[in-house]
């Protein structure tokens, strides 16, 4: 593994615990296999991508199940699909500079596969699979929490599949707090061409929205509040210190 890639991985996920080869496989594109110049690499990241896809699906399903208790199965499935599709995963991969460290065959490098949506998405899932094998589910949770749940685009992805006002009601019910309160705080324009600015408050979290109809302004306010709530939510999992809990 190139020294710069080793340093990159150690910065990204911590100690590799003697499993550098596992992570190297996670970064190995299938174009490498059969490449005589890289004959020492005999496995691509496709198997790890298969595993990482399943682990990621579980973690995102857990997050959505816990945070949207009133959402129907179909709505949760649509939201999960949008989070884990290739476009979204490639975005998350680019944000951590993953493409710069992909190991590619000569032909793939020539066609700029390094920045392709599918290659980045596959490598991102492969890395999650490697983390799971090396460090366990808690570490995989931590990686997903940091690089997906708290990514700047995550709240917008989730909100795009939700009715924002309904989401706020679900949140208030799940956390046993008062229902959201909507207040018109400003009106602008002539009587026939007004714009309304609405503020919503829920559990001391506020959001604002402006639109020509109060109903639309309320939705925009709820969207902003939900984005702030999601940004503050950790994954609903507390790592267990099994060593400390075991008596000797």
Curated annotation (Swiss-Prot):
Biological processes annotated in GO: mRNA processing; regulation of gene expression; rRNA processing; tRNA processing
Active site: 53, 125
GO (cellular component) term, any one: cytoplasm
Pfam family, one: Ribonucleas_3_3
Domain RNase III: start-end pairs: 6-136
Record text on subunit structure and interactions: Homodimer.
Task performed by this protein: Digests double-stranded RNA. Involved in the processing of primary rRNA transcript to yield the immediate precursors to the large and small rRNAs (23S and 16S). Processes some mRNAs, and tRNAs when they are encoded in the rRNA operon. Processes pre-crRNA and tracrRNA of type II CRISPR loci if present in the organism.
The name this protein goes by in its record: Ribonuclease 3
